[in-house]
């Protein structure tokens, strides 16, 4: 039975511990957080919006590489219910070291404009006194 990780996500970006970062940078901490609770060969269901988008640069691929396990990622918006109802997930397997390193860099580069967009949105939705709407 696969273990499930549920996180907010966007293409190439994952929210973990109340901050957004590239899937590449967040995948090692996500992998460490489940290392002690399951068999090292079990699949991981990565229930996170857009976790499969980006193919080899996707957040699901980053988690597969970091954990050494197969990861099921999802295209577009997803939640626990829709993830259990359909077979829209795609399985990502850990890559060889060279490919994993290239894709790690690609994910980090592709996440930059998305993170910039989040920063601008936050900036534009702040009141002058610093409170967020």
Swiss-Prot record:
It is found in: Secreted; Host cytoplasm. Keywords: Host cytoplasm, Secreted, Virulence. It comes from the Bacteria. GO terms for cellular component: extracellular region; host cell cytoplasm. Effector proteins function to alter host cell physiology and promote bacterial survival in host tissues. This is Secreted effector protein SteB.
């Amino acid at each position: 039975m696969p273990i499930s990780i549920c996180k907010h996500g966007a293409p190439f970006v994952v929210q973990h511990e109340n901050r957004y970062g590239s899937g590449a940078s967040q995948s090692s901490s996500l992998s460490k957080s489940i290392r002690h609770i399951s068999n090292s060969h079990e699949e991981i269901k990565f229930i996170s919006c857009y976790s499969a988008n980006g193919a080899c640069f996707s957040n699901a691929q980053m988690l597969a590489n970091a954990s050494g396990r197969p990861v099921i990622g999802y295209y577009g918006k997803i939640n626990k219910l829709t993830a259990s109802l359909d077979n829209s997930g795609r399985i990502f397997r850990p890559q060889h070291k060279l490919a994993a390193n290239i894709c790690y860099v690609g994910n980090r580069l592709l996440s930059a404009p998305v993170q910039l967009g989040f920063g601008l949105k936050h900036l534009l939705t702040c009141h002058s006194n610093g409170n967020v709407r």
